[in-house]
């Protein structure tokens, strides 16, 4: 696991050698883009956003979102949603995320 930095925000990332792409923690990306103060707030924001995407019929996008164990702030390995750059761009191109 690597840590990437975007506007002074830490984003957990993992290189998937099978698909030869970086996968990023969706919660970390959401937190960075929405300037959430805590990981809990970013997690809540992502949960609401996932529900909106499901309501819009974007289930196929979420189906491709997988979970990996990544090091959490408390030092434990916890499952978190991860997505490639392409998947992230699709999530945030949806109408429900335009006010992002």
Name these PLM-found stretches:
Residues 1-100:
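An anion-engaging/catalytic patch
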